């Protein structure tokens, strides 16, 4: 697309970053200054009743600065990148029609990628194929299926852990249904995002600072009633660890504690470690991201001013 045709597109802002990097706080500050409306880009914040462990903005913050695409699914329901793209495009169109600018804030990089580049035409899930895969896993173990994936799609196998049955079974399912690998199909993108996007990433300057923030926030969540929140989900009886909601960082570890699999101290340790691993994956995504302007979360006023400097001209 030429620069001239790109300039004629409506404007949008991406504010990306790892967990515990201060994205939401900066977005709320920007909302006070710029003609923007916030859209959440977070695969955990979509779930109702999952507030403390996801660091969801509180009621007071949401009253002052509404966020779209929060609390749109029950934890028993799935929500795909395709679902997100559809919903986000509808919200962006609504915001643009009102003469304002969509500000998309979050850390689910797969959602940002799907929105920006479009989605490859993957086949829909097939219950029969999935059942066959799960039967094979029950008989031979997931390690055996991972070796099978390595033979047909080594690129996907290198990316998917043998202990991740959800992604492993999906990669095999795609191959069995279409005869093409997940890697082949995902190299074919769909429609690009019809917006002129200004992209920002916020993170602390050092990994140690981010690790400190993550540990501090996990303990704050525990002090705020995270265990009681997960106990309420646990007591429902219809939720389990195969669901994306309960596999969210922190929830999975607390669930193991409630099931008596691990001690409280082990839950805290694993929860902090899993959150750090998530942050590492998010930063790895962002380092390979083109056209992103990095902001230092330890200098919030400077970060805000840098965004205003870049975005101010388009918001005037």
From Swiss-Prot:
Under NCBIfam families, the record lists: miaA
Q: Which residues are recorded as binding substrate? A: 19-24
- Any one GO molecular function term: ATP binding
Give the protein's biological function. Answer: Catalyzes the transfer of a dimethylallyl group onto the adenine at position 37 in tRNAs that read codons beginning with uridine, leading to the formation of N6-(dimethylallyl)adenosine (i(6)A).
- Keyword DNA-binding attributed: no
Q: Which transformation does this protein catalyse, written as a reaction?
A: adenosine(37) in tRNA + dimethylallyl diphosphate = N(6)-dimethylallyladenosine(37) in tRNA + diphosphate
This one is known as tRNA dimethylallyltransferase
